[in-house]
């Protein structure tokens, strides 16, 4: 018993200083990477691209008869579970925007597709910078990946929603205990979806190896922050509705912008946590050292990519 208590004390004595050093390094790293500025930039790009993304997604789903009415279900699910409060105003605005795009020509549709690709490209660049990745993917590979996201992504989302709706309509679960467990699962489903979405983002986007444990920790932190921010943002909007007095009918626009900004801030914080966990040797660095280390890592990545390209050509 004494040996166990001693071992716990030893682990605790190592854990506390290590945690303090990690959080200090994390704050310095986020300061260097200007996370708040990049979140605002991505929010701006997202607002410009959100209608093109929804239009491309819904247009692809409409090509398959099996996904009939899935588009409306998808919009409702996203707004109800991922947009806190004022969902009706945001839903109405998005539906009007998307319906208006149906009147566009083929050239306009091509521009919408390009805008959607630009959003994915900017996400890719920002996350790879957090991981100090200078070795860019080949343009053909990047375009293929973006194309798969825009084409296969909507199909997978539509299939999952269609299957879920079909299973829930069967009413296979009659037992009260199982029904309670099923309802509990549905309540936790948004958190689980957020976790796996962040996990996939932190694993697939960086052109660099990411450890499973690091990605899971970063995704868990981001998912919890996302759920807490939903509740906090909804409380603020409902209890302090000053935005309606100022903006009136246009209140949905600043609400949506602030919420998208918070979402990207959480995404980047989770990415910073994941990347910082893999840099244990730098946890004791000061801010100036972090600046120089980041520049050195980017330079080294670039020189390695050029060397590998030269050796391949030879």
Swiss-Prot record:
This chain's protein is named: UPF0761 membrane protein VIBHAR_00593
Keyword Repeat attached: no
- Give the transmembrane ranges: 41-61, 104-124, 143-163, 185-205, 217-237, 249-269
Its subcellular locations are: Cell inner membrane
Identify the GO cellular component terms for this protein.
plasma membrane
* Pfam hit, one: Virul_fac_BrkB
Superkingdom assignment: Bacteria
Record has Cell membrane as a keyword: yes
User: Which PANTHER family does this entry report, sorted A to Z?
Assistant: INNER MEMBRANE PROTEIN YHJD, UPF0761 MEMBRANE PROTEIN YIHY
Which family does the UniProt entry place this protein in?
Answer: Belongs to the UPF0761 family.
Going by the UniProt record, its keywords in alphabetical order are: Cell inner membrane, Cell membrane, Membrane, Transmembrane, Transmembrane helix
How does the protein associate with the membrane?
Multi-pass membrane protein
